[in-house]
C-alpha cells in the first residue's frame, strides 16, 4: 500500500456530498503503511503510531485545500476512526499492487449515516475488471452505480 496514489472513483449514497464542489470529494496523494498496517501515513508523510494518516485534498468553494486525516485503528474490528464532516469509520477493503479500495461510513452531527466508497490507484485509470470490482463494492454498500463519480477527470 506504500507509495503515491491517485483517487480515481468515489461513490456515496448521498451523491451531492461527492459532486465536484461537495465537501467529501476527496483526492488522495500518498499513503504509507507501517507496523503491520496499524499505522498508515499519507500526503505530508507524517508518521504516527497506531494511527492512519491519509493525505487528502478537498475542494472547498472551488479552492483545493490539503488536509491530513488521522484515523485511530480499532484493534478489535480493524476499522479506522477519524473525524471529518462527522465521525468516519473506514476500512481498506482490498489492496493490490495497483489499486486500493476503501469503504467509509460517516455519521454526521445529526446522527445521519452515509456510505462512501473510493478507489485509489497507482495510475490514472482502471481496467474494466477493476471498474467492475469498484461498482460491485458500491452496490454491496447500498450505493447505486449511478452515484459513482470519476474524480481523476476533475
Residue ranges and their predicted role:
Residues 1-154:
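A beta-rich soluble binding module of mature secreted/lumenal proteins
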Amino acid at each position: 500500500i506504500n507509495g503515491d496514489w491517485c483517487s480515481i472513483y468515489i461513490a456515496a449514497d448521498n451523491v451531492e456530498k461527492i459532486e465536484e464542489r461537495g465537501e467529501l470529494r476527496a483526492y488522495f496523494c500518498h499513503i504509507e503503511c507501517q507496523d503491520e498496517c496499524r499505522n498508515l501515513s499519507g500526503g505530508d508523510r507524517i508518521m504516527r503510531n497506531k494511527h492512519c494518516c491519509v493525505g487528502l485534498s478537498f475542494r472547498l468553494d472551488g479552492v483545493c485545500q490539503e488536509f491530513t486525516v488521522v484515523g485511530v485503528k480499532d484493534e478489535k474490528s480493524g476499522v479506522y476512526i477519524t473525524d471529518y464532516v462527522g465521525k468516519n469509520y473506514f476500512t481498506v477493503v482490498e489492496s493490490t499492487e495497483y489499486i486500493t479500495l476503501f469503504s467509509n461510513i460517516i455519521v454526521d452531527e445529526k446522527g445521519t449515516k452515509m456510505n462512501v466508497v473510493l478507489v485509489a490507484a497507482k495510475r490514472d485509470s482502471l481496467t474494466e475488471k477493476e471498474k467492475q470490482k469498484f461498482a460491485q463494492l458500491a452496490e454491496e454498500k447500498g450505493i447505486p452505480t449511478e452515484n459513482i463519480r470519476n474524480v481523476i477527470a476533475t
